[in-house]
């Protein structure tokens, strides 16, 4: 009887300290289900991930200049089945107002940080919600300056796009 009670008690305590199964960590590998848009992906586990600290032009609802191209690039970088690791940015919230996990997405095969790569090629701009700059803030800002100077991606396709990392990217209405 005592042994049974001890096992039940230990099992109950383990449940209190074990991490929740739905909380992705950078040590766990996940598989991409599909790309929803340029800065949002869905995992086969059912989790929705918003790429943290970046913003891409909108594709749906109010389509913006370069939105489709940014989304297509993310789809090429993260085709269905791609193995990724997710890293939380301590400077930001863990989840956005839509219930998406805010994470850096890193491909397992080559270590490519997709958030950084999208900014590097001009498909995204830094977005520091509430002014909270994370671990890659300086790198993202430097890559944006370079992409703008070289007219890469949205910076070449959408002339006059303002750059304000505290407000996100707004390329304006999609031009025909």
Which stretches of residues belong to each language-model region?
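Small beta-barrel nucleic-acid-binding modules, primarily SNase/OB-fold domains
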Residues: 2-8, 13-176
